[in-house]
Amino acid sequence: TGRELWRTSIGARIAAGVGSDGRFAAVVTRDGELVVLDGGKPAWRKELGAKVVTAPLVAGERVFVLGVDRRVLAFDALDGRKLWVLQRPGEALTLAQAGVLAAFKDTLLVGQGPRLAGVDPLRGTVRWEVPMGSPRGTNEVERLADLIGPALRLGTRLCARSFQAAGGCLDTE
């Protein structure tokens, strides 16, 4: 119907888009604070200690955040309790551009440099990993092949593109 359900101000500038599951909405401020709203009212706030440019993902009463440093954090949407952190080794140089963070069935899909990882959203463990970008070039900047958002999901397929390179699709099942 287009009827406004709620409107609010969090009192800070937003660094990335809004993530929502219809009940909870989550944003990250430019000061690195995760703000979660429940029905438009502030539920809780957490300092992240990392720069974030990818919109949070809200799914299954959890809030997932992907930092520019490729660290993935999971929080309980109800009380803000940190559930787990996934930090993978990778290249020192990363992009300050929105990455890939999506959900499919019981798997969290996360861009980790040029690779797409399927992560268990309950435990933060990597179930599978697939290379989607091919770093090429003579220096670190030319070799950047981080997956950048937004990703597109069509049925069981997820399509993404890497920085300075072609895109690709994979079957998530």
Feature roles, as predicted:
Residues 29-30, 67-68, 111-113, 162-163:
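Structural signature of WD-repeat beta-propellers
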Residues 38-41, 76-80, 121-124, 171-173:
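Short loop/turn segments that connect beta-strands within beta-propeller blades
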Residues 148-173:
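Beta-propeller domains
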Residues 70-71, 81, 114:
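Tandem repeat domain/solenoid detector
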Residues 4-21, 43-59, 82-105, 129-155:
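Extracytoplasmic beta-rich repeat domains
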